[in-house]
Structures are given as C-alpha cells and as structure tokens.
Amino acid sequence: MDELKKLAGVTAAKYVKNGMIVGLGTGSTAYFFVEEIGRRVKEEGLQVVGVTTSNRTTEQARGLGIPLKSADDIDVIDVTVDGADEVDPDFNGIKGGGGALLMEKIVATPTKEYIWVVDESKLVETLGAFKLPVEVVRYGSERLFRVFKSKGYCPSFRETEGDRFITDMGNYIIDLDLKKIEDPKQLANELDHTVGVVEHGLFNSMVNKVIVAGKNGLDILEK
C-alpha cells in the first residue's frame, strides 16, 4: 500500500505549477506529496512557496529545501494536498487523526484547489467509525468532557505515552466515539458554537478532488 500511497502523492503533485503557493499536508500519504514537491524543487527548479499544516511537515519541508511562509503572510493558497481519515460520498470528511486538525483547517480555508490523498479504506458511506477529534483549550476541558459525555458522545482525552496529547497549538484533543454521524453539518455547527472548542475534525464540503489509492491503482474523484 505504501507504493500506492506514494503514487497518489506524486499524482497530486502534478497539480502544482511554477509560482504557486502550496499547502503542504500532514500524514502518511501527504508525506509522499511533500517529498515529491521537494524533489521537483531540487531537480526541476520548481519555484513554489509552501505553507505547512504541522510542525512535523515544517521540519520535512525545510529538510527538502522547500521555501516556506507562515499562514499569517498569505491571503490565498493555490492548491493544498492533505490526507483524510474518512471521506463520505458528499465529500465531507474527518481529519485530525495525527492531531494537526487546527492548522490543517487554517490552511484549507483560503485554498482554491483542495485535494485529499487517501487509500481506499478511508472511503465510507457514513462518517463516524473513526473517532472525531475535537481540539479544546485546556482551561475548562474537564467540564467540556462532561458535557460531551452527557450528550452520549463517548469522549476520551487523547493521550501519548501515558500523558495527555498536546497539539502544536498547545491544546488538548477530546476524541468523540460517535460510531455514526447522520448529519455532519449539524454536528459541525453545534461544535462551532460550543465554548472551549477551538476546532473540530469535520471538514464538510471543503475538498474539490480526492485521489484514492486502491489495490487496482488510482481513482480520482471530483465534485
């Protein structure tokens, strides 16, 4: 599957042209996209400016010699390529399994052409089997946890090596084990209006193309 993920990443890189501002995604498939952009910068003289979606991707891009700018310094991104944890037939998705959902959404929002690269296991009829990440400020997070629990959202604080996971922005993540999300837009609206929630992993109707790596090769889905 790694070879197919690599092929998906390389294919996505073909949408990147000279002079573009490019959003550089995070995750196992987006990794290959960033690697290919780095190769083209070095070997073909590709001239682009990258905007990264995580500290991990920043380190990768710098190591490859890709020029970078902060999201603060740009108004429009030409193309962003990123991964996703689930994608439904309406191009709604869940992201944030790697913990970078806030930066990913900040980069996705001003993007003209937003592309996801995924393997075929990420295509689902209904979102929710993958736990929905919700990034929350630390202050009041225990109360917020109880609110989610009272709603039957089966929350859990994300942990790493026995300690609470802390995002690149210094926040906690509460994962919601919802099993099935019948109305992603309604849930997104609810979370958007919940005090203490910084961002959530529902990316509804944001993506333009999904490049799918499957056992039979690549499939490019478009709206």
Curated annotation (Swiss-Prot):
**What residue ranges carry the coiled-coil annotation?**
none
Q: Which reaction(s) does the protein catalyse, per the Swiss-Prot or TrEMBL entry?
A: aldehydo-D-ribose 5-phosphate = D-ribulose 5-phosphate
Key word Nucleotide-binding present: no
Enumerate the Gene Ontology biological process terms.
pentose-phosphate shunt, non-oxidative branch
Enumerate the residues binding substrate.
T26, G27, S28, T29, D82, G83, A84, D85, K95, G96, G97, G98, K122
Listed pathway(s): Carbohydrate degradation; pentose phosphate pathway; D-ribose 5-phosphate from D-ribulose 5-phosphate (non-oxidative stage): step 1/1
What Enzyme Commission number(s) appear in the record?
5.3.1.6
Task: Please name one Pfam family that this protein belongs to.
Answer: Rib_5-P_isom_A
Q: Which GO terms describe its molecular function?
A: ribose-5-phosphate isomerase activity
Q: Does the keyword DNA damage apply?
A: no
Specify the enzyme's EC class, one word: isomerase
Q: What residues sit in the active site? A: E104
Keywords of the record? Isomerase
NCBIfam families with a match to the protein in the record: PRK00702.1, rpiA
For this chain, the family text in UniProt reads: Belongs to the ribose 5-phosphate isomerase family.
- Subunit description: Homodimer.
Matching PANTHER family = RIBOSE-5-PHOSPHATE ISOMERASE 3, CHLOROPLASTIC-RELATED
**The protein's role, per its UniProt record:** Catalyzes the reversible conversion of ribose-5-phosphate to ribulose 5-phosphate.
By what name is this protein known? Ribose-5-phosphate isomerase A
